[in-house]
Amino acid sequence: MNTKLHAVTDADGRPLSFFMTAGQVSDYTGAAALLEGLPKAQWMLGDRGYDADWYRDALQEKGITPCIPGRKSRIAPIKYDKRRYRSRNRIEIMFGRLKDWRRVATRYDRCPTVFFSAIALAATVLFWLSTMSPAPRKIVRTDVI
């Protein structure tokens, strides 16, 4: 039993939405599921698994420029911004930080719904609760000398 986790992150690598599919399912299924919930953005960075003409067209209809390298099997190569594509490592870093949680890394939960809930909990704690904590206050000493 294996699964694929598809994710959308913001420019800082914080997760915005997740979708889980079976491991043998094509990446196009995850792309189609996440397409409706995409936030307003200028660019969409994705790996070769998301290279499909219908997906590129759907992104452009939403006003999003795709930055997805073409599959090796394409007859005509697709041009993409290689400099911008380098920043895709932020999503890989996000997946790595999620796997710091042992329950997520070892796939402790066999039920996909419970596993997905563990991922959502880990993402909430790692990325969103840490940004909501108040800034440290400046300590003012009032000692009299």
Identify the residue ranges that each predicted region occupies.
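Polybasic low-complexity intrinsically disordered regions
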Residues: M1-S73, A122-A123, A135-I145
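Short hydrophobic "helix-edge" motifs at membrane interfaces and signal-peptide entry regions
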Residues: G37-L38, D81-R83
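Basic, amphipathic alpha-helical segments enriched in Lys/Arg and hydrophobic/aromatic residues
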Residues: R56-G63, K82-I145
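Short, conserved micro-motifs composed of acidic
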Residues: A76-P77
